[in-house]
């Protein structure tokens, strides 16, 4: 596979691009993460989402600890070529490290942020005490 397609992406100054994970079938936005060239190549090689963890400064195979992997159905690049959209099958039904289906569980309502999505699995059960 020629790496030329990677050169058409508009990477930020840190060599990253935001990647939105969207659930196939429902169209729900599950999470936003970051990718670099290596994580994007690994994603294509494995068929599963591999992101770049800015906090840990390393590749992060989504679900490597929890088992909640994301099978990539398709990838799209936006019109400015600076944001990726990954259509994924969310295995295990949990995309968020908090144990929720998605990471967007705070809704602005009545002048404050309200939690509107339930915890489906206790993070301690998924990760032990690593959270």
Swiss-Prot record:
* Catalytic reactions of this protein: 1-(5-phospho-beta-D-ribosyl)-5'-AMP + H2O = 1-(5-phospho-beta-D-ribosyl)-5-[(5-phospho-beta-D-ribosylamino)methylideneamino]imidazole-4-carboxamide
Q: List where in the cell it is found.
A: Cytoplasm
Family membership noted in the UniProt record: Belongs to the PRA-CH family.
Task: Tell me how this protein assembles.
Answer: Homodimer.
Q: What gene does the UniProt entry assign to this protein? A: hisI
Gene Ontology terms describing biological process: L-histidine biosynthetic process
Claim: Hydrolase is one of the keywords in the record: yes
Query: What keywords sit in the KW lines?
Result: Amino-acid biosynthesis, Cytoplasm, Histidine biosynthesis, Hydrolase, Magnesium, Metal-binding, Zinc
Keyword ATP-binding present in the record's keywords: the answer is no
| Alphabetical list of InterPro entries matching this protein | PRA-CH (IPR026660), PRib_AMP_CycHydrolase_dom (IPR002496), PRib_AMP_CycHydrolase_sf (IPR038019)
Source species, please?
Answer: Thioalkalivibrio sulfidiphilus (strain HL-EbGR7)
| Enzyme class of the recorded protein, top EC level | hydrolase
Question: Which residues of this UniProt protein bind Zn(2+)?
Answer: 79, 96, 103
Tell me the Pfam families matching this sequence.
PRA-CH
Q: In which pathway does it act?
A: Amino-acid biosynthesis; L-histidine biosynthesis; L-histidine from 5-phospho-alpha-D-ribose 1-diphosphate: step 3/9
Q: What does this protein do?
A: Catalyzes the hydrolysis of the adenine ring of phosphoribosyl-AMP.
Q: Which residues bind Mg(2+)?
A: 78, 80, 82
Give EC number(s), comma-separated. Answer: 3.5.4.19
This protein's cofactor list reads: Mg(2+); Zn(2+)
Cellular component, GO, one term: cytoplasm
Any note on cofactor binding? Binds 1 Mg(2+) ion per subunit. Binds 1 zinc ion per subunit.
Gene Ontology molecular function: magnesium ion binding; phosphoribosyl-AMP cyclohydrolase activity; zinc ion binding
Protein name stated in the entry = Phosphoribosyl-AMP cyclohydrolase
